[in-house]
Swiss-Prot record:
GO terms for molecular function: GTP binding; GTPase activity; guanosine tetraphosphate binding; translation initiation factor activity. Pfam families: EF-G_D2, GTP_EFTU, GTP_EFTU_D2, IF-2, IF2_assoc, IF2_N. It is found in: Cytoplasm. The gene is infB. This is Translation initiation factor IF-2.
């Protein structure tokens, strides 16, 4: 369309024709009406006038970018918490736009002024929803009152070519009297832009002359009328963009200064707005944001905001209106959700989640925002610390302890590492360690009372009360080794047990019952060797009376004293049998004196302990001994119920190859029958067979009767309590519970011991002798392991890798191969396959039947592992009689051997006035001209010292050697 008249040119520029006519007249073009023709020269004059009014081209945009990095912790699919690095990049562009472009929820200022008069009329302009494909970016402003640049151009000038669409300066209002209003507009726009996730927040300030004030441009005006209003001006050859930039008359310098100040104030307000989003985020309530829109520069407070107009009236195709609606809704949703989900607490807001540029373009920003909001909710799940009461059982794994405290197992492991204990997640902790960890986490630790199935046993015992009847006494024979305990019992039993025992010493605890003329007596024979302390303690625990056997020719020995202590600890009365009185060297009076020193006072001295002189060889005094024992039993009035389920004590236990686990039981109360379900420690079973001490089958056994039973699931520990239960299922449950409890406690103790030994042996060259011990009975295993472990020293440590009852099997040899151990068999032998495997792999198998033989050989092996001792031995003394200095050789000493011998490989010590001057080696030794290996006393020789030429007449050389001597334990 050709712009031939003023009206057509005004239509092309989309501005009122009368405004354009006024600007043409101000440019010096003589036109009378809007129907007059406009030439190219007229357009050039108008363009030149507008350029003079505005000055040089200024930047049209401010681009602000921000990049923030934060960390969030989020659980993955496996439940593990992972730290994720989140980088948020946001960009915001402030653009000076044309008045014809859509305004983003902001009122535009349209003011116009005459070339000389500064007053400005104001009216909010409605945003026009222009099609996106319309190629008319260079649309002129409606009017320019003063040449005032926007704060965006002041803050960051970006000169661009004139034809560019964004190069047209946004015409700001040049109001010398009201610069603060522009600042108010910017602040209002900033308040609107903060909660909205919009990348391009564009500011628009337009101007208009007083003439169009009468035009209807109120907020109620529709966008269509606003769009059709400036459409009646013909095109000319001059570029519309240039005409638009020059569409205002020149202004005085004073007005430019005022405009510059206003622009600086607006730029300061913009900077303040950029630094304000963090404060906005801390206030989740949306009320302050709504209040910021209540009173603006162009509208009094209380009226509906102009931002609502684009949401309702703008075309759906207008991108500005659509984006404004979406972002406003999303922003309000976030604000409401934040206010609803996040109560007011003292935690600071996380500024990396939301912000003045929080959103993105299109759907991406919303999706990212939702994910960030979920992360925020995930963080809120972590609650404050709550102190709990933690019930800690005897043993507990690290994982279970962490679960009880509601923390991760890794935190418990870290805490244990701080306490100096290296553990894994499945490792079992003892109760003491677990309680320390619980207290370290700030909880209260309580020793738990487990759901113990053994409580059932107490209930059973309470129910089975019955009338007690007299029972036979249980007598334990104690004393030092070789004092004649077993021989005394042999005479009483009319049997020969001692002659059949290895080495003539008792190594098992034996139980027998003997029928005498005055009644039945049950005897327990205990070992006297020092290794069997635990066995003697068990014997004293199970007994009613103790016979203390003391040899009349030997007196009180260490194990005699130990037996006295066991008897006193158990509160058991003593009867002293002074044995071997038939020997010529017997001295019973000395024995009495020594026992009085141990607080065992005989009756004849005013005490309460009967002393009976006996001889196991001739039988003298045996009847008096039994009479005293039965007298003590009558005083004690021993009774026990008979018609109740049996209870007893495991005296000894072993693994028999043909019969399985065999236990020697002393029945203490009730009656034990064949077929009863029994529980002994961690083993249970049904009694399949019962044998007396002579090996005969019996069906029942009453109180104080020792029997051997078969049918247990495994070998019980000596000293365990045995009881009969009515329910086999209950017996199995209790046995399994005890097994797990014992295993857990053992593992926890082992771990603590390993840690202690690891720190003790750190940096030391400690040798370790590994042993695997297999014995015939449980008591021997216990005694042997205890004796061998006591042999450990600072340099050599005995480590019992495995100890069990039974023969040496192939699995034992395999364990010895893996641990490089020596296998010790005590009264047992190896299987044929185990022998072959041991020979093939060079494993040392040792068999013993006397306990102190095993102890002595292990001690000898440990001695061989000790580092040899180095000793210095002086072998000769040499005196220097002459000193020669020879070139290329050094100082040669002519010497006389005064004592001993001098060897060429010996070490020497140089003495001067009996003070050591030097210690080293001989370099050469000669007699006359010949090299010799040694020179004996009384002969002279010549010698040189290695590395020392300081020799004088009268010096002495002490010749010595270092010898290694094997050490013993």
């Amino acid at each position: 369309m050709s712009s031939n008249t003023v009206a057509q040119f005004a239509t092309e520029l989309k501005m009122p024709a009368n405004v354009l006519l006024e600007q043409l007249r101000a440019a010096g073009v003589d036109l009378k009406s809007v129907d007059d023709a406009v030439t190219d020269s007229d357009k050039a004059k108008l363009l030149e006038s507008l350029r003079r009014a505005h000055g040089a081209t200024e930047g049209k945009k401010i681009t602000l970018t921000r990049r923030q990095t934060s960390e969030i912790r989020q659980a993955d699919a496996t439940g593990r918490s992972r730290t994720i690095q989140v980088e948020v990049r946001k960009k915001r562009v402030f653009v000076k736009r044309d008045p014809a472009e859509p305004v983003r929820a902001e009122p535009a200022v349209e003011t116009a002024a005459k070339p000389v008069e500064p007053p400005v009329a104001e009216a909010p302009a409605e945003p026009v929803a222009a099609p996106a494909a319309e190629p008319q970016p260079e649309q002129p402003a409606q009017a320019e009152a003063q040449p005032e640049p926007t704060p965006a151009a002041q803050a960051e000038p970006e000169p661009q070519p004139e034809p560019q669409p964004e190069a047209a300066p946004a015409q700001a209002v040049a109001e010398p009297v009201e610069p603060a209003k522009n600042v108010s507009v910017t602040e209002t726009e900033a308040e609107q832009a903060r909660p909205e996730p919009v990348v391009h927040a564009q500011t628009e300030l337009t101007s208009q002359t007083p003439a169009p004030v009468a035009q209807p441009s109120a907020p109620a005006e529709s966008p269509k009328s606003a769009k059709a209003e400036p459409a009646a001006a013909p095109k000319t050859t001059a570029k519309p963009g240039e005409i638009r930039r020059a569409a205002a008359p020149a202004a005085p310098d004073r007005a430019r200064e005022e405009a510059r100040r206003a622009a600086e104030a607006e730029a300061a307000a913009l900077r303040e707005m950029l630094s304000r989003p963090r404060k906005v985020l801390r206030a989740p309530e949306p009320e302050p944001q709504a209040g910021a829109l209540s009173g603006t520069l162009h509208k009094p407070a209380g009226k509906p905001a102009t931002t609502a107009a684009p949401k309702k009236d703008a075309k759906p195709g207008a991108p500005g209106a659509k984006k404004t609606i979406k972002t406003a809704e999303v922003s309000s949703t976030w604000s409401d959700d934040s206010a609803r989900k996040k109560p007011a607490d003292n935690k600071p807001a996380v500024t990396t989640r939301d912000g003045w540029r929080a959103g993105g373009k299109g759907g991406r920003g919303g999706r990212n925002s939702r994910n960030q909001h979920q992360d925020r909710r995930h963080e809120q799940v972590q609650q404050e610390f709550i102190a709990r009461e933690i019930h800690v059982p005897e043993t507990i794994s690290v994982a279970d302890l962490a679960h009880k405290m509601s923390v991760k197992a890794a935190e418990v492991i870290k805490q244990l590492m701080k306490l100096g204990q290296m553990v894994t997640i499945n490792q079992v902790l003892d109760q003491e360690t677990a309680m320390i960890v619980v207290q370290e986490f700030g909880h209260t630790a309580i020793a738990a009372k487990l759901d113990d199935p053994e409580a059932f046993l107490d209930e059973t015992a309470a129910v089975t009360e019955a009338e007690a009847e007299p029972r036979a006494p249980v007598v334990t024979v104690m004393g030092h080794v070789d004092h004649g305990k077993t021989s005394l019992l042999d005479y009483i039993r009319r049997a020969k047990v001692a002659s059949g025992e290895a080495g003539g010493i008792t190594q098992h605890i034996g139980a027998y019952h003997v029928e005498t003329g005055r009644g039945v007596v049950t005897f327990l024979d205990t070992p006297g060797h020092e290794a069997f302390t635990a066995m003697r303690a068990r014997g004293a625990k199970a007994t009613d009376i103790v016979i203390l056997v003391v040899a009349a020719d030997d007196g009180v020995m260490p194990q005699t004293r130990e037996a006295i202590h066991h008897a006193k600890a158990g509160g058991v009365p003593l009867v002293v049998a002074v044995n071997k009185i038939d020997k010529p060297e017997a001295n019973p009076e000395r024995v009495k004196q020594e026992l009085v020193a141990e607080e065992v006072v005989p009756e004849e001295y005013g005490g309460d302990v009967p002393f009976v002189p006996v001889s196991a060889k001739t039988g003298a005094g045996i009847d008096d001994l039994l009479e005293n024992v039965l007298l003590q039993a009558e005083i004690l009035e021993l009774k026990a119920p008979i018609e109740v389920p049996a209870k007893g004590l495991v005296i000894e236990a072993r693994l028999d190859k043909g019969r399985g686990p065999v236990a020697t039981i002393l029945v203490q109360s009730g009656t034990l029958k064949r077929g009863d379900v029994v529980l002994a420690g961690a083993s249970f079973g049904r009694v399949r067979a019962m044998l007396d001490e002579n090996g005969k089958q019996i069906q029942t056994a009453g109180p104080s009767i020792p029997v051997e039973i078969q049918g247990l699931t495994e070998v019980p520990a000596a000293g365990d309590e045995l009881m009969v239960l009515s329910d086999e299922r209950k017996a199995r449950e209790i046995a399994l519970f005890r097994q797990g409890k014992f295993r857990d406690v053992k593992l926890a103790r082992q771990q603590a011991a390993k840690l202690e030994s690891m720190f003790d042996n750190l940096g030391e060259g400690t040798q370790t002798l590994a042993l695997i011990v297999k014995t015939d009975v449980q008591g021997s295993q216990e005694a042997l392991v205890s004796s061998l472990t006591k042999l450990s020293t600072d340099e050599v440590r005995v480590q019992v890798v495995h100890a069990a009852v039974g023969g040496i099997s192939e699995s034992d040899v395999n364990l010895a191969i893996a641990s490089n151990a020596v296998v010790i068999g005590f009264n047992v032998r190896a299987e044929q396959s185990a022998k072959k495997l041991a020979e093939t792999n060079g494993i040392d198998l040792r068999y013993y039947n006397i306990i102190y033989d095993a102890v002595d050989e292990v001690k000898a092996a440990m001695s061989g592992m000790l580092a040899p001792e180095k000793r210095e031995e002086v072998i000769g003394l040499v005196e220097v009689r002459e000193v020669y200095t020879i070139s290329r050789i050094g100082t040669v000493a002519g010497c006389m051997v005064l004592d001993g011998v001098v060897r060429r490989d010996s070490q020497v010590r140089l003495l001067r006035n009996n003070v050591v001057q030097w210690t080293g080696h001989l370099d050469s030794l000669r007699r006359f001209k010949d090299d010799v290996k040694e020179v004996k006393s009384g002969f002279d020789c010549g010698l040189t010292l290695r590395g020392n030429n300081d020799l004088q007449l009268g010096d002495q050389l002490e010749v010595f050697e270092i010898k290694e001597i094997a050490r013993t334990l």
